[in-house]
UniProtKB/Swiss-Prot annotation:
PANTHER family the record matches: EFFLUX SYSTEM COMPONENT YKNX-RELATED, UPF0194 MEMBRANE PROTEIN YBHG
Keywords per UniProt: Coiled coil, Periplasm, Signal
Family: Belongs to the UPF0194 family.
InterPro entries: CusB_D23, UPF0194_membrane_YbhG, UPF0194_transport
One Pfam family matching this protein: HlyD_D23
Gene: ybhG
Compartments it resides in: Periplasm
Organism: Shigella sonnei (strain Ss046)
Source organism superkingdom: Bacteria
Disulfide bonds: none
Signal peptide extent: 1-26
GO cellular component: periplasmic space
Descriptive protein name: UPF0194 membrane protein YbhG
Length: 332
């Protein structure tokens, strides 16, 4: 009879142990959270001159740290300086022609055109009268048909000269045609565009660093003649620092943009970096070999981009990283 209470007490103890163990396991899972594995993104850019030419100088070498806006190299500027001077001269010529078209004709030019009409009119009147007389003489058989034809030709030439002078005077008095003004304006705009291109080409003969980074390779040396777009430097971008990781679909709800995480490296396992998820791929892919584990080889995963908010020089591109989604990280 005494065994029954002992059994009951033993059952209670076992049940309590199971409950306590389950609670500890649950809390442990909650505290540890989701763990992912990834790498610091390798981000490089090839730098080149947008124009071609002979390399005049290079200011940096492999391993140098560079800053955005820093001059990295220069081509021979002389050909582009000459092209710029030619473009400026072209604008001056086009501007002068356009101004003349807008201003029209001066009073002196109009007076000269009127005098030319008067002179041409007198010449025509004389030629017409002479032709009339020659017609009478030809009818009386005093002159030959050839003499009459010469008189007619002189009259016709004088008439054409008079018409040309009259047209010129009419143009001077009415000003330039709108079509001529529009053509002069278009020529000016074309010259201005050529000037802008020449200025840009001269500017692009200097290579400027687009962002901070570290110079990985220097592909050419001074004296090299480059085609436009030929690679001069390869630069590793140091800021911002991104970590690429992959999450299984089962845990996708925990890896939302804006979620804060802790990032551990082998070199400093007790001092994590801090990061924030900036991007989650909308499409799934098979686990890349760089983060492949035996239980994930056939899994479809989603790529994450994590922005490291406190990166330093110890965090190098390509370095393996452990991403911890603990509660502490998620609510910092």
């Amino acid at each position: 009879m005494m065994k029954k209470p002992v059994v009951i007490e033993l059952a209670v103890v076992v049940l309590a142990a199971v409950v306590a163990g389950g609670y500890w396991w649950y809390q442990s899972r909650q505290d540890n959270g989701l763990t992912l594995y990834g790498n610091v993104d390798i981000r490089t850019v090839n730098l080149s001159f947008r124009v071609g030419g002979r390399v005049e100088s290079l200011a940096v070498d492999e391993g140098d740290a560079i800053k955005a806006g820093q001059v990295l190299g220069e081509l021979d500027h002389k050909p582009y300086e000459i092209a710029l001077m030619q473009a400026k001269a072209g604008v001056s010529v086009a501007q002068a022609q356009y101004d003349l078209m807008l201003a029209g004709y001066r009073d002196e030019e109009i007076a000269q055109a009127a005098a030319a009409v008067k002179q041409a009119q007198a010449a025509y009147d004389y030629a017409q009268n002479f032709y009339n007389r020659q017609q009478g003489l030809w009818k009386s058989r005093t002159i030959s048909a050839n003499d009459l034809e010469n008189a007619r030709s002189s009259r016709d030439q004088a008439q054409a000269t008079l018409k040309s002078a009259q047209d010129k005077l009419r143009q001077y008095r009415s000003g330039n045609r709108e079509q001529d003004i529009a053509q002069a304006k278009a020529s000016l705009e074309q010259a201005q565009a050529q000037l802008a291109q020449a200025e840009l080409n001269l500017q692009d003969s200097t290579l400027i660093a687009p962002s901070d980074g570290t110079l990985l390779t220097r592909a050419v040396e001074p004296g090299t003649v480059l085609n436009e777009g030929g690679t001069v430097f390869t630069v590793s971008l140091t800021r911002p620092v991104w970590v690429r990781a992959y999450v299984d679909e089962r845990y996708l709800d925990q890896a939302q943009p804006g979620r804060k995480v802790l990032l551990y490296t082998d070199g400093r396992p007790d001092k994590p970096y801090h990061g924030q998820i900036g991007f989650v791929s909308p499409t799934a892919e098979f686990t890349p070999k760089t983060v492949e584990t035996p239980d994930l080889r056939t899994d479809l995963v989603y790529r994450l981009r994590i922005v490291v908010t406190d990166a330093d020089d110890a965090l190098r591109q390509g370095m393996p990283v452990t991403v911890q989604f603990g509660n502490e990280a998620g609510h910092e």
